[in-house]
UniProtKB/Swiss-Prot annotation:
Catalyzes the hydrolysis of 4-amino-2-methyl-5-hydroxymethylpyrimidine pyrophosphate (HMP-PP) to 4-amino-2-methyl-5-hydroxymethylpyrimidine phosphate (HMP-P). The active site is at D8 (nucleophile). The lineage of its organism: Bacteria, Pseudomonadati, Pseudomonadota, Gammaproteobacteria, Enterobacterales. This is HMP-PP phosphatase. SUPFAM superfamilies: HAD-like. The gene is cof. Keywords: Hydrolase, Magnesium, Metal-binding. Pfam families: Hydrolase_3 (PF08282). InterPro entries: Cof (IPR000150), HAD-like_sf (IPR036412), HAD-SF_hydro_IIB (IPR006379), HAD_sf (IPR023214), HMP-PP_phosphatase (IPR023938). Its cofactor is Mg(2+). It catalyses: 4-amino-2-methyl-5-(diphosphooxymethyl)pyrimidine + H2O = 4-amino-2-methyl-5-(phosphooxymethyl)pyrimidine + phosphate + H(+). Belongs to the HAD-like hydrolase superfamily. Cof family. Coiled coil: none annotated.
Amino acid sequence: MARLAAFDMDGTLLMPDHHLGRETIATLSRLRERDITLTFATGRHVLEMRHILGTLSLDAYLITGNGTRIHSLEGDVLHRQDLDPQVADTVMHHAWDTRASMHVFNDNGWFTGQEIPALLQAHVYSGFRYQVIDIKSIPAHQVTKICFCGDHDDLIRLRIQLNEALEERAHLCFSAVDCLEVLPLGGNKGSALAVLSNHLGLSLADCMAFGDAMNDREMLGSVGRGLIMGNAMPQLIAALPHLSVIGHCGNQAVSHFLTHWLDNPHLPYSPE
């Protein structure tokens, strides 16, 4: 039986309205009652995740910024990884040929260059929001990650530009169809989960994980049991064809799977 369960948030644990369902919350509590350690592994900021965690009355480790930070149950930093300052400087100051908006994250929050109210819809549960600022004024040595939000085809073209400019100095991945992330080299949820597992005296074989996007690829592919959401990016399903695909986040599929796993661990699972 798994001893550590890792959950992506958007498109996985959260429903399409960006809230946690009642069944999901109840199932997470059942896992804790079985002494299974929880960690939320997300691209969201730790400041936002602390607020969400506080509303749940659950003990959980936090892997945030797509693996750039790990926080303990008490809120202490267990692991931190920032973008190479030269990479951050290049990304923030270059005039990219794109219509996508740029978003910069550091320990102080989420920063962008203009008001984009539509992006706040994903954060209605917590009330977390961006700060509008001159991006070029942000110190490059304090950047955890940078992401671009926009049309997928535009982001694919931007990824080519970024790869040419950054070469092998950063990790690029899609955390959603409309979001391209620039992360520290070697920084991802999978490597962070390996650090956390080691801290807990566990191996990745002792973990199960759930996700839906390409920023979950390393995590899902490295654990003892990786589960892909039915609403996942097709690229993720294609990249990890050996993993089981469960139901849709809108149907609280993680809760559905875990309820079966807790109650009938020896019976085959069907998402229907």
